[in-house]
Swiss-Prot record:
Pfam families: GcvP2_C, GDC-P
Cited InterPro entries: GcvP, GDC-P_C, GDC-P_N, GDC_P, PyrdxlP-dep_Trfase, PyrdxlP-dep_Trfase_major, PyrdxlP-dep_Trfase_small
Single Gene Ontology BP annotation: glycine decarboxylation via glycine cleavage system
Source organism per UniProt: Bartonella henselae (strain ATCC 49882 / DSM 28221 / CCUG 30454 / Houston 1)
Secretion signal span: none
Name recorded for this polypeptide: Glycine dehydrogenase (decarboxylating)
Keyword Oxidoreductase: yes
EC number: 1.4.4.2
Alphabetically ordered keywords of this record: Oxidoreductase, Pyridoxal phosphate
């Protein structure tokens, strides 16, 4: 077997191509280029101290041996995490398919119709289960979904009602996350408290953490009378058999779709869900997929109501959510499509019947179970023997939950067998009864659900395979072309890095399994912590935040708690440059901080005079500065160390946004520069795929004095959790472990250098026609550059939207649009792209500029040309009545390098965004209904 260094496969340039690019950039070596781009004061000056790189095969073998130290006991712990069977047709054709996992968040609707359509079905699934009309296109997990729900309730009362009343027993990890969020928002969360006039919402669990259903009719009636919203945390499998919560008064329903065919993965990733009533639509957090039409009246999908979101409303946004859990939401939807409503109900009925037989057997021998009504989970009273019984269960290869000394909880699921139930019953001196009556509370579903045709269309694996292929063919992902999104780092997600995620030893471990049952995970996480600390210079890393935005929130919480520990409770003001990503101010607001914006100069740098003035003006209240480095303008600011020192001199801490860490690895370290805390987007710099809008992982690194203030977890007896599981989306950490293990210090540094070279090469080529808006001291950019396309608007009426849509005809996803400067494109090629693809992209943008000139010269009218009509579908270009002033060839094949056999055709023309928001349609109506 030929084993070349992995980095030679990861990095797209061949040695001879590198020299050609250096010639275009007008520099003699890549080291010289880096020395011109990167301030000398922040150079690391030594190699990273990491294990020597190994081959793909060696890394896979090493990780496999490590993860084999996890014990694959069968889990009956429950607590929001369940065994589930992932249909192989979904595992292979969706979860392990780069057409699905390498796509980006679907901001560009026309090239994202496949995953938008399936997310639309996800929203339909949630609406059907809950009975509520509007659902988000996934949230990060169940706990954060409830935290978002209480924020919705708080905002709905115009932030006047400050109390949240928990009227049932939540899972402990959910309660912990809610308490963390409530603390920063000034909300009072209490259990079984009186509902009063200043109660914003009550929270009900369906079922509760012990598995019991309770009669909430009176408390709901009281809440409605007092003007409080009703929030329900509901099990989506139980909902297939039970009346939809909206029918008995729910205003918001949240939960996790993990048990719909998504592995436990030691905590994630999983798709949380949230559905609301019509009155709460514009307060809902995260993404919503809406239906609209294209220019020909064809149905198309798009992200709707984006004015609620952080990238537009910043600190006024409904949430800081950017990346959610699109890939896992799509997996759950595919699971529902695969089984159909009847199949889902059969699974639920089998699980419930097995639980009833188990409980019946216990009751027959006088064993007491708490709660008259249940679905798949029961609390059993054992009077001081809880741990003894749990040990006996474990000896038989089964894990159960110890609630306290006197009670154990056993949760059955899709994978539970009669043999399992019988073995567990024997622990109590019981067996199973042959027959048992249902023990669900209230009446079951009295109406059909999931009657929409797409939940009934799949009858065989052939159908399912083609269904998923049909959807993925509509999309443009990294498996087809470069995605040059600035600040998003759409690099290669290598197959060897992804393979371990599907291993049973990675996928099938419960997050609350004991440390001795997850030794492999603990070792992998320990190693990854050490490697990331070396790469960044920090003292400790927390892997709990399950997105970059969650990392920001967790990091700011650490800073806030640090100040409070020193008695400086007044330090709640956060300085943020005007160029910052929208999640920065949104996260600061979520962390209970006041945002003050710092000006930027014309060259893109932070205005040091304005920063100094505001740091001194707010010296007594200053908590932190949030700063991205290199800046969102694609430049290494020379004064970054001075900026950090200035904040420290005025009592603040420096929050380092790690969105652009791909431009630092191996060259400089945030902690050495002066950062106190930094989040690392593992789904950018460290090779975890974007999944079409999630999963993401945003661990935070901190300096020594902030270590005590990292997120804790109730499972470990600590507080201030920000996610449901102790290590967040733990299963995909193996991707980053593999990436670092195979790249080694040399490979990581070379990747960073190559990313810088590629960006400067693009800047050099495009500067023939376009202005590169920002450059560093020596005329260089960092790993990305901002191309000023406003001249095309001024001279020819061609907008940045027109350019983005026209790039689709050339076979490209558009770069980041209008951020941080309206009317511009921010381009990041990463280190993974070959020169030929980079040249093809540059040729496309240069060709578009030439097309714009034809408008100026009168060859094409301003309102009838290939740019304003882009993108062009196959159907449109074959239209018998073609009457454009440009040819079909110019429409669909504007560049001779386009291969007709490999041409990407968008399924729709330009989507009407205004129409989609004016008449919001975010789920399919039941069969027989009309819009």
């Amino acid at each position: 077997m030929l084993e070349r260094p992995f980095f030679s496969r990861h990095i797209g340039l061949r040695p001879d191509e590198k020299q050609k690019m250096l010639d275009i950039v007008a520099v003699d070596s890549i080291d010289t280029l880096v020395s011109q781009a990167l301030p000398h004061s922040i150079h690391l000056g030594r190699p990273l101290n990491l294990p020597k790189a190994v081959s793909e095969g060696q890394a896979l073998e090493e990780l496999s041996k490590m993860m084999e130290r996890n014990y694959l006991h069968k889990s009956f712990i429950g607590q929001g995490y369940h065994g589930t069977y992932v249909p192989p047709v979904i595992l292979r054709n969706l979860f392990e398919n780069p057409a699905w996992y390498t796509a980006y968040t679907p901001y560009q609707a026309e090239i994202s119709q496949g995953r938008l359509e399936l997310l639309f079905y996800f929203q339909t699934l949630i609406s059907e289960l809950t009975g509520l009309p509007v659902a988000a296109a996934s949230l990060l997990d169940e706990a954060t979904a409830l935290a978002e729900a209480i924020t919705v309730a708080f905002r709905f009362t115009r932030e006047k009602k400050m109390k949240i009343s928990l009227q049932s027993l939540l899972h402990p990890q959910i309660l912990s996350v809610v308490q963390t969020r409530a603390e920063t928002q000034g909300l009072q969360v209490s259990k079984n408290s009186e509902i009063c006039s200043d109660t914003a919402a009550i929270v009900l669990s369906w079922p509760d953490t012990k598995g019991s259903f309770n009669d909430y009719s009176e408390v709901i009636k009281e809440a409605k009378a007092k003007g409080a919203l009703v929030i329900v945390v509901a099990d989506p499998l139980a909902l297939t058999l039970m009346e939809a919560p909206a029918k008995w008064g729910a205003d918001i329903v949240v939960g996790s779709m993990q048990r719909y065919g998504v592995p436990m993965g030691f905590g994630g990733p999983h798709a949380g869900y949230l559905a609301v009533s019509d009155a709460l639509t514009r307060l809902i957090p995260g993404r919503i997929v809406g239906q609209s039409v294209d220019t020909k009246g064809r149905v198309g999908f798009r992200l709707a109501l984006q004015t609620r979101e952080q990238h537009i409303r910043r600190d006024k946004a409904t949430s800081n959510i950017c990346t959610a859990q699109a890939l896992l939401a799509n997996m759950a939807t595919a699971y529902a499509v695969w089984h159909g409503p009847q199949g889902l109900q059969e699974i639920a009925q089998r699980v419930h019947h097995l639980t009833c037989r188990f409980v019946g057997g216990l009751e027959a021998v006088g064993i007491s179970c708490e709660g008259e009504y249940f679905f798949d989970c029961v609390s059993i009273v054992v009077k001081g023997k809880a741990r003894e019984i749990a040990c006996q269960a474990k000896a038989g290869g089964r894990l159960i939950r110890v609630l306290d000394d006197d009670r154990v909880v056993i949760n059955f699921d899709e994978l539970s067998t009669q043999e399992d139930a019988h073995a567990l019953a024997q622990l109590f001196g019981a067996g199973l009864v042959d027959q048992a009556s249902p023990r669900l509370m209230g009446k079951g579903r009295d109406t059909t659900f999931l009657s929409q045709p797409f939940f009934h269309a799949v009858h065989s694996e052939t159908d399912m395979m083609r269904f998923l292929r049909r959807l993925s063919d509509k999309d443009l992902a990294l498996d087809r072309a470069m995605i040059p999104l600035g600040s998003c780092t759409m690099k290669l997600n290598a197959a060897a890095e992804l393979m371990p995620v599907s291993w049973p030893t990675v996928a099938n471990i419960h997050p609350f399994a004991s440390r001795e049952d997850a030794v492999g995970y603990q070792e992998m996480i320990h190693q990854l912590n050490a490697w990331l600390c070396e790469i960044t210079g920090f003292a400790q890393v927390s892997f709990q935040p399950n997105s970059g935005a969650q990392g920001e929130y967790a990091g700011l919480l650490a800073i806030r708690r640090y100040h409070q520990s020193r008695g400086e409770h007044q330090r709640t003001l956060c300085l943020i440059p005007a160029s910052a990503h929208g999640t920065n101010p949104a996260s600061a607001h979520m962390a209970g901080m006041e945002v003050v914006v710092v000006k930027c100069l014309n060259d893109g740098d932070v205005d040091l005079d304005d920063l100094k003035m505001k740091a001194q003006l707010y010296k007594e209240r200053l908590a932190a500065l949030m700063i991205t480095y290199p800046s969102t303008h694609g430049v290494y600011e020379e004064s970054i160390k001075d900026i950090c020192s200035l904040i420290h001199e005025n009592g603040g801490q420096v929050y380092f946004d790690g969105a652009n860490l791909n431009a630092l690895v191996g060259l400089a370290r945030p902690a050495d520069i002066g950062a106190d805390v930094c989040h690392m987007n593992l789904h950018k710099t460290f090779a975890i795929p974007h999944g079409g809008g999630g999963p993401g992982v945003g661990p935070i690194g901190v300096v020594e004095h902030l270590k005590p203030f990292l997120p804790g977890h109730e499972q470990e007896g600590t507080t201030h959790a920000v996610s449901a599981a102790p290590y967040g989306s733990a299963s995909i950490l193996v991707i980053t472990w593999m990436y670092i293990r195979m790249m080694g210090a040399e490979g990581l540094k070379y990747a960073t250098q190559t990313a810088i070279l590629n960006a400067n090469y693009i800047a050099a080529r495009l500067s023939q026609v376009y202005s590169i808006l920002y450059r560093g001291k020596h005329g260089r950019v960092a790993h990305e550059c901002i191309v000023d396309t406003r001249v095309l608007k001024e001279q020819y009426g061609v907008s940045v939207d027109d350019i983005a849509k026209r790039l689709i005809d050339y076979g490209f996803h558009a770069p980041t649009m209008s951020f941080p400067v309206p009317g511009t494109l921010m381009i990041e090629p990463t280190e993974s792209e070959p020169k030929a693809e980079i040249d093809r992209f540059c040729d496309a943008l240069l060709s578009i500029a030439e097309e714009a000139k034809k408008i100026g010269s009168g060859v094409w009218p301003k309102d009838d040309n290939p740019l304003v009509h882009a993108p062009h579908t196959l159907v449109d270009t074959l239209d018998d009545t073609w009457a454009r002033p440009y040819s079909r060839q110019e429409a669909a094949f504007p560049n001779c390098s386009l291969d007709p056999a490999n041409k990407y055709w968008p399924p729709v023309s330009r989507i009407d965004n205004v129409a989609g928001d004016r008449m919001l349609i975010c789920s399919c109506p039941p069969l027989g209904n009309t819009y």
